[in-house]
């Protein structure tokens, strides 16, 4: 996947647990885990907005374009 979700890094920097973030944002821990493991295929803007609000970050802090591995 060429988009990486830096949720782990932001949680560590903010000394926040995944369960605390889930409660604040109103998303299940299971869905946040999918994001954290880079297995999500999409994210709603409302979810991205809520994550950025609670983590006090910009979308670019949370999402990173890593490029394709198979580029020639």
Regions found by a protein language model. Give the residues of each.
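Short alpha-helical DNA-recognition segment
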Residues: 16-34
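Residues within the helices of the helix-turn-helix
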Residues: 8, 19, 49
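Short, charged recognition helix plus adjacent turn
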Residues: 9, 34, 63-72
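A short, Lys/Arg-rich alpha-helix, primarily the initiator
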Residues: 1-16
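Alpha-helical residues within the helix-turn-helix
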Residues: 12, 23, 53
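Short, basic-rich loop-to-helix N-cap that marks the start of a DNA-contacting helix
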Residues: 39-50
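Residue-level recognition of specific faces of alpha-helices
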Residues: 6, 31-34, 47, 61
């Amino acid at each position: 996947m060429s988009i990486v979700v830096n949720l782990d890094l932001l949680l560590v920097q903010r000394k926040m647990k995944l369960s605390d973030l889930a409660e604040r944002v109103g998303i299940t821990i299971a869905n946040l885990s999918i994001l954290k493991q880079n297995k999500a295929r999409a994210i709603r803007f409302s979810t991205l907005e809520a994550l950025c609000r609670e983590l006090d970050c910009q979308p670019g802090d949370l999402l990173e374009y890593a490029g394709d591995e198979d580029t020639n």
